[in-house]
Curated annotation (Swiss-Prot):
Disulfide bonds: none annotated. GO terms for cellular component: cytoplasm; nucleolus; nucleoplasm; nucleus; SWI/SNF complex. Part of a SWI-SNF complex. Belongs to the SMARCD family. It comes from the Eukaryota. It is found in: Nucleus. CDD domains: SWIB_like. This is SWI/SNF complex component SNF12 homolog. Residues 435-456 are annotated as: Disordered.
Amino acid sequence: MSKNGTTGNKKKKTKLSTAATIAANIAKANATLNNNNNSNNNSNNTNIGNSINGIPSSLPPSVTLPVEELISFAPECLLFSQLLEFEEKLDASINKRLIDIQEASRRNSIKNIRTLRLSIYNTYSNQSAYYHLDNKSLNSVQERPSWSLRVEGKLLDESQDELVNKSIKSSSSSSSTANKRKFSSFFKKVFIQIGHRDTCEWDKSQTFTETDGFEIKRNGNQEVDIKILMYLDHVPQKYKVLGGLSQLLNIHTDTKPRIILALWHYIKSNTLLDAETKKITCDENLKNIFSLEELQFNQIPQLLREHLSPPDPLEFQYTLHLSGDAKDYEQAYDIQVEVDEPIFNPNPTMRKEISQLNDEINHHIQKVYQHKRKREFMEKLSSDPLGFLNDTTANLVKDFQVSKSTTSTGFEEERHASFYYQPMTEELVKNYLSKQTTPNPTPQQISMAPSTPQTP
């Protein structure tokens, strides 16, 4: 018995020491987070309770434990509540950092320049057997000659992004392709002209799914020239600078804030701003562009509208080939596109893992509640068995009465005989009996009274 008692004490001491260690670590982490938060309180007052960039918030506020009720027999529940508080502070600190980085990226337009390789080719079928057939013969054939035009693309030089993504993702194979952008996401409109009469148009605003390429299928056996116009989807919106303003600022296509900033640098470098009146005196170049002698700085955005236009589309010429190998006629082009930093991309793998952990925690918390109710049941039964059984039976009877009573009078009234001596009872019984149909008597069941003999 002494050995068992010693072993139990050792287990209890080990358990308490582990709990104390966890509590100490939580206290240290809380102190560190408090210091960091206090130093950054003035940096941003944005609401950080919501999830940022697809990172799910940890546990919902409803997932808590009744610490006051459990601490008497399960002191470890206090550690769980402390972990929840620590997790909230950790999420708040991370979200603050993400917001700061996002605001800095918006101001500085942090983008990665990547190379998008565009491939244009076509395939064909049922062409060789129709060289010597006229139009009437073609109409009589079931399998008509056809061709398909394919426009595809993929990003090159993905090694750098993959290294960054691997540092923030798990080692699963699916995570390496989770955040790859689709080809159609880089364009907002694609216009294809086939010959002189046939045209096709794809608009990003009218579609809900992204694709890895575009395919056009047509029936025919003639080689035609195809013109492809592709409009890049710039985020933020970019504009083409027209005329003399483009030569003055040495800008062809850029965002409106950058164009205004370049114009402001030109004004400052040439000392065209009057410090007293805050007006800009136009030199010969600005006079030729804006046709004004002087202007206010707040007039610049409105004046720029006449000198900005949507950027030019990417134009490609392709000739349809209906003989030979398709790879021999494939055309490839490299396009420079802007891609966001990998840190801002949502991480589906991490979100799924966090969601699974949250579900597991919720499952265990529900088990804790179940065991708590069982313990309360057993505790009441052990303290006052008779009274507890009487209370439980009374509650069950009430539930049974509510579930089985189908009339509006109540279950208790129907238990007394006086309920059935009411005037309506006789009427209800008569109605019930009148509805009962009696079977028709059969010929064998009909009894005839003997006839009386007639006297002559």
